[in-house]
Amino acid sequence: MKKRLQGTDLFTDSFIKHENQNYDQFLSEIENYKNKNSEWRTYIVQWVHQMKSSISSMRLALQNRKRSKENMQLLVELDQIDKQLNNILNLARLEAVYRDLKIEQINLSESINRIINQNKRLFIQNKVFPKVQIENTTSTVLSDKKWLDFIIDQLIHNAIKFSNPTDQIIFNIKQTDNKLCLDISDTGIGIIKEDIPRIFDLYFTGKNGRSNNNSSGIGLYLVKQILEQLGHKIKVESEQSKGTKFTIYFD
């Protein structure tokens, strides 16, 4: 029994590594399709859906197995690949985001707690702890629920990726200059000064991304572009070895 499970684990791990290689190769081909013809978006959507179907099957197989530390790690890896695929899909559809907007009143505190709960497996796996703070203010904003959830989720993943075990990620809702703001701060490795002006550039991974070897340079680009379409703003402050803070301003 032990030998059979080990074989299955090795197969699963091999699958994940293979799909990561496919993902890296696919990123390098996007610009070629984009420049050669107008059908590149169709190709991307089809490719992503095929990959997501394979990942769903693998996730179901893992969830049906006996719970273990190894299986938990594999599920986290599958979740990461799935999110990378969603980023590619959103990148392909970025020009049409404005058609998909539904602006409404959103309880920011409820959204944050919901997204934290959705990512609890990732928090547990990395031994990173979330903390939500509200500075005596309303937490209601006008925005698009789906896309705001996506943005907060991206910033959470970015913070966890560059945090150390036992670090905290702090969510602080506050008023600044009569504007509601959301700070998402970590106590992780921070960003070198030279990289900060470029972190929202497409495909830019910086020193941390190259060291981590798990960055595509897509997530923060999407965050900035979608926030602009929502009429919100974002800024970043960071100090190497002390952490990073992203602030979203809800105009």
Question: Model-found features: residue ranges?
Answer:
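Short beta-strand/loop element within the Bergerat-fold HATPase_c
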Residues: 133, 166-178
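Short conserved segment of the HATPase_c
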Residues: 191-203
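Conserved catalytic submotifs in the C-terminal HATPase_c
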Residues: 129-139
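Glycine-rich GHKL/ HATPase_c ATP-binding element in histidine kinases
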Residues: 242-246
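Acidic ATP/Mg2+-coordinating residue in the GHKL
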Residues: 186
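Short helix-loop "hinge" at the ATP-lid/N-box region of the Bergerat-fold HATPase_c
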Residues: 159-160
